[in-house]
């Protein structure tokens, strides 16, 4: 009989560091994505792209591939949809688009490649060498020059953003018009993916499951699905025998105080090795 570890997070890289650490220690380890991103406010963005442009904004700032996807979806819709009568289309070809890194630059280049003659597709993409939002903000300040800047910058964001870039640009005299174009939410496939994990042959002889939680928000989302299969509270032997681990104190507090679950192991630091050591220590006490 074996022990299986279920990591409630998407694997990062190949190989994934958490999966590598647990597999090397003899555990059957599976990562299960919990969250997904989805585009939002598509109609509002489409209207903005159609009706605004350089006359309204000094520049556009995009710091994620998802935001690039949102702009591309708006361009696709405008170019492939019905014409807007005699209304003059806005022109974004002369508007600078500032991006973080090569991934976002490549994503915007793909929009232009798909619609090479479109007035909505970005042509002037800058800042690719910036590795972080902070570096990009300083690049924008230098590139646009000294105030005054009467027109705002259009900033496409998700629902979870740090204030670093807006704060730096505001301090430099720029006004931002922020538009949320995507959001992070619980995976629509989580139940299906969980069932698929439980059907894997490698878990057929599992005697004990360790379920590892990585954040309060994902914990809250997953618990209703997990408790259909796992004995999270240690009271129902018809379900899969389970112990609970946490990546750190914030998640532990949520699990104990809000979800009213017992946390059997907590990583002293949020690393694969510290998580593994916490689970091994708990297992040692269990088998004495």
Question: Over which residues does each language-model region extend?
Answer:
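Conserved beta-alpha
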Residues: 1-288
């Amino acid at each position: 009989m074996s022990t299986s570890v279920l990591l409630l997070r998407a694997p990062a890289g190949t190989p994934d560091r958490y999966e590598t650490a647990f597999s090397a220690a003899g555990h059957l380890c599976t990562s299960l994505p919990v969250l997904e991103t989805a585009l939002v406010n598509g109609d509002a963005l489409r209207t903005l792209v159609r009706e605004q442009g350089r006359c309204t904004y000094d520049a556009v700032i995009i710091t994620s591939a998802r935001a690039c996807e949102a702009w591309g979806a708006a361009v696709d819709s405008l170019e492939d949809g019905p014409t807007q009568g005699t209304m003059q289309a806005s022109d974004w070809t002369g508007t600078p688009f500032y991006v973080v890194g090569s991934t976002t630059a490549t994503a915007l280049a793909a929009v232009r490649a798909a619609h090479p003659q479109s007035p909505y597709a970005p042509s002037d993409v800058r800042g690719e060498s910036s590795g972080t939002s902070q570096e990009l903000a300083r690049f924008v300040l230098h590139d646009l020059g000294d105030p005054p800047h009467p027109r705002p910058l259009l900033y496409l964001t998700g629902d979870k953003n740090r204030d670093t870039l807006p704060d730096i640009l505001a301090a430099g005299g720029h006004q931002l018009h922020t538009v949320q174009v995507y959001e992070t939410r619980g995976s629509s496939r989580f139940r299906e993916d969980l069932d698929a994990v439980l059907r894997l042959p490698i878990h057929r002889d599992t005697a004990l499951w360790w379920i590892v939680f990585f954040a309060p928000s994902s914990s809250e989302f997953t618990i209703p699905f997990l408790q259909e299969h796992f004995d999270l509270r240690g009271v129902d032997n018809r379900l899969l025998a389970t112990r609970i681990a946490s990546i750190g104190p914030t998640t532990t507090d949520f699990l104990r105080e809000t979800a009213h679950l017992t946390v059997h192991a907590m990583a002293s630091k949020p690393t694969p090795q510290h998580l593994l050591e916490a689970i091994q220590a708990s297992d040692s006490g269990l088998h004495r």
